[in-house]
Amino acid sequence: MTNERAAPASRPAVTDVDLFSAQLGRLRFVHLRRRDVVAQAVSWAKSLQTHFWHPGEAVAPGGEDPHYDEELIGRLVATIERSEADWTVWFAAHSIVPCEVTYEELAADPPRTAQEVLDYLGLDVPPDRQLVVRHRRQADQLNADWITRFKSH
């Protein structure tokens, strides 16, 4: 006598997109990424070291003065690249074509980029409102130096 059981009846897989759609209705996806992953990794490394995440802040409690750490930057580049690859696979697996926005486009022309995203989402800014840009770049000469140094290896 064997100890076999009948396999459970297969049910259609419920995806995370299905779950989100059930709760939120029609979904539209905006994929924000940075073309220059080394610059992104450098900014991330500095923030990890200083605990400074927003313009106008100083080194936060527990933070330290930034110092070049090639190993950390390399690990962060790899993390960013894996994450971007994972998003590419996830979007493709769900037949999703997101609105692609790069940090570089957003930083160069925030109002235009925001309007493109709103258009993609089918949203209008109410007539009595306007888009206000509050973004300030945190990158400085130290970022530029670290980027150059990392890319030269």
Protein language model features and the residues they cover:
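An alpha-helix initiation/capping motif
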Residues: 104-111
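PAPS-dependent sulfotransferase catalytic core
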Residues: 59-74, 105, 125-153
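PAPS-dependent sulfotransferase catalytic domain
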Residues: 1-98, 111-126
